[in-house]
């Protein structure tokens, strides 16, 4: 979503190959237990350490939580934007009757040709490599954790759905956005089930673990931070699904390419909506918004599924991310490109009349993307071929990181 960034946390943007990074501390890993037992308060022995491991805790450490960091008077900004949101935000939603549904892309169970359609789907899926399925499954699991994302939006002061059926424009947007996003996980889940290439039970466990763990975006109930985060993430998912579409086509599965491309188009439309909110905030409060943008980038944007766990692998998100990086589905360069795009979209270079802190934030943001790209280029030049590891999602078949 004072915070201390853990340099080992998997959400850092310029990822290095897993073979060259130390493992991320985990609630389940020996390293975390070692760190915990070195604390004076926990020096009595392993039983005391073990007793602190509560059920349903995330698989890795989360940051110190900061709450309600937006000054209360700024809530009025979002109340004043109600009419603006109705006219400029809700237009990016599609009428349900005109929207695509998962069944539009899948074999029809009511038709006489259902079994033949499933056989054709499975034949096409046989041509897709295991590493592609690892990335597709990871993307699907990310989409299926939608309850967490709606919860996150409803933590934001001034825009949350206060009743569950609030008539405010902000609440209508959140519910309708969630309803549109819900189709993404449904469609990918059903496709993967029919493909016969994956271990659905392990995938379902991963989804349950992930929703139970939540997410740690470090947005502090602050809609400035929250909408900057969602602007970044919607563009990231647009890129990721667009790349899985392209690769499905390269492997000969035109139907899967259509599925991923359709989801990518939704993400692009949602990105447009969220970036418009932040653009309006820059118009109303340029100083506060540029400092919020810099704050999120200093903390580094964490991916929504960074607390992913399958019951076995504490470093599952790192491993999934490494495969996505190697295949070119979502990379450190993409992270820098998104930042560069948003800096241009919101015209950060052209902001004037800022405070001293605002000017510092502006300078930081304008220089950050080139710096990330330089770091990534050096990392790629030093990168070694990653090891092969088993993924439970594909029946423990091994895939190179």
From Swiss-Prot:
Report the locations given in the UniProt record.
Plastid, Chloroplast stroma
Q: Which reaction does it catalyse?
A: octadecanoyl-[ACP] + 2 reduced [2Fe-2S]-[ferredoxin] + O2 + 2 H(+) = (9Z)-octadecenoyl-[ACP] + 2 oxidized [2Fe-2S]-[ferredoxin] + 2 H2O
Residues with the modification N-acetylalanine, per the entry, are 36
Leader sequence range is none
One GO cellular component this record assigns the protein to is: chloroplast stroma
Q: Where is the transit peptide?
A: 1-35
Protein family: Belongs to the fatty acid desaturase type 2 family.
Please state what the protein is called.
Stearoyl-[acyl-carrier-protein] 9-desaturase 7, chloroplastic
Upper lineage ranks?
A: Eukaryota, Viridiplantae, Streptophyta, Embryophyta, Tracheophyta
């Amino acid at each position: 979503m004072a915070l201390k960034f853990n340099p080992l946390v998997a959400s850092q943007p310029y990822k290095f190959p897993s073979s060259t990074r130390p493992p991320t501390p985990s609630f389940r890993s020996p390293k975390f237990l070692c760190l915990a037992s070195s604390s004076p308060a926990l020096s009595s022995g392993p039983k005391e350490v073990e007793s602190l491991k509560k059920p349903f805790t995330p698989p890795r450490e989360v940051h110190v939580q900061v709450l309600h960091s937006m000054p209360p008077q700024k809530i009025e900004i979002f109340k004043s934007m109600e009419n603006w949101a109705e006219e400029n935000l809700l237009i990016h939603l599609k009428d349900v009757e005109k929207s695509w549904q998962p069944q539009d892309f899948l074999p029809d169970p009511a038709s006489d040709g259902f079994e033949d359609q499933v056989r054709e789907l499975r034949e096409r899926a046989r041509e897709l490599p295991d590493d592609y399925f690892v990335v597709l499954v990871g993307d699907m699991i990310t989409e299926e954790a939608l309850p967490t994302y709606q919860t996150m939006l409803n933590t934001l002061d001034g825009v949350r759905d206060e009743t569950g059926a609030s008539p405010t424009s902000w609440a209508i947007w959140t519910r309708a956005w969630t309803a549109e996003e819900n189709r993404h996980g449904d469609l990918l889940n059903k496709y993967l089930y029919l493909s016969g290439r994956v271990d659905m039970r392990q995938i379902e466990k991963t989804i349950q673990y992930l929703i139970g763990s939540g997410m740690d975006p470090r947005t502090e109930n602050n809609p400035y931070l929250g909408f900057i985060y969602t602007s970044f993430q919607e563009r990231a998912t647009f890129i990721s699904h667009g790349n899985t579409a392209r690769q499905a086509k390269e492997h000969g599965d035109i139907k899967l390419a259509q599925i991923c491309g359709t989801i990518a188009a939704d993400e692009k439309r949602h990105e447009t909506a969220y970036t418009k909110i932040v653009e309006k905030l820059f118009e109303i409060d340029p100083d506060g918004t540029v400092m919020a943008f810099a704050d999120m980038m200093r903390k580094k944007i964490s991916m929504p599924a960074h607390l992913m766990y399958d019951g076995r692998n504490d470093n599952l998100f790192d491993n999934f991310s490494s495969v996505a990086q190697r295949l070119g589905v979502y990379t450190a360069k993409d992270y820098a490109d998104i930042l560069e795009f948003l800096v241009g979209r919101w015209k950060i270079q052209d902001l004037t009349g800022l405070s001293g802190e605002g000017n510092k934030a502006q300078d930081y943001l304008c220089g950050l993307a080139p710096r990330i790209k330089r770091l990534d280029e050096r990392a790629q030049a030093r990168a070694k071929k990653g090891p092969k590891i088993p993924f439970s999602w594909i029946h423990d078949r091994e895939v190179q990181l």
